[in-house]
Curated annotation (Swiss-Prot):
Modification note: Acetylation is generally linked to gene activation. Can be acetylated to form H3K9ac, H3K14ac, H3K18ac and H3K23ac. H3K9ac could compete with H3K9me and prevent gene silencing. H3K9ac is restricted to euchromatin. Methylated to form mainly H3K4me, H3K9me, H3K18me, H3K23me, H3K27me and H3K36me. H3K4me1/2/3, H3K9me3, H3K27me3 and H3K36me1/2/3 are typical marks for euchromatin, whereas heterochromatic chromocenters are enriched in H3K9me1/2 and H3K27me1/2. H2BK143ub1 is probably prerequisite for H3K4me.
Ranges for region Disordered: 1-43
In-chain residues carrying the UniProt-annotated modification Phosphoserine: S11, S29
UniProt organism field: Griffithsia japonica
Modified residues (N6-methylated lysine): K5, K10, K19, K24, K28, K37
Compartments, record wording: Nucleus; Chromosome
Modified residues (Phosphothreonine): T12
Protein name in the entry: Histone H3
Length: 136
């Protein structure tokens, strides 16, 4: 069926508004629960979808730089003490780590969808890593 253009139509009167009963009017004018307004809440999933769109658009690093740097230094300490890192080296490690994690979560999400679920679980991560050949 072809779409047609809608044009504005002039109102032709209609019904006149009826007067409300006294109790209804009093109930509507008085604020609910002593004037305390509830904070606005979005429906479940709305904020999650908004965050997904925002993070897919962005290119900035998602893990904070200093905590990641401390983690790198802590892991490197097991191999050799008093190691020094150039800032560009830590940045390259962080880029690689985040790219790996994003890819792993994409594959994990596919595993969850394949199982007819929308929630990812540890078994999805294990399956994704096993298919990739990272873990036997």
């Amino acid at each position: 069926m072809a779409r047609t253009k809608q044009t504005a139509r002039k109102s032709t009167g209609g019904k006149a508004p009826r007067k409300q009963l006294a109790t209804k009017a009093a109930r509507k004018s008085a604020p609910a629960s002593g004037g305390v307004k509830k904070p606005h809440r979005f429906r479940p999933g709305t904020v999650a979808l908004r965050e997904i769109r925002r993070f897919q658009k962005s290119t900035e690093l998602l893990v904070r730089k200093l905590p990641f740097q401390r983690l790198v230094r802590e892991i490197a300490q097991d191999f050799k003490s008093d190691l020094r890192f150039q800032s560009s080296a830590v940045l390259a490690l962080q880029e690689a780590a985040e790219a790996y994690m994003v890819g792993l979560f994409e594959d994990t999400n596919l595993c969850a969808i394949h199982a007819k679920r929308v929630t990812i679980m540890p078994k999805d991560i294990q399956l994704a890593r096993r298919i990739r050949g990272e873990r036997t």
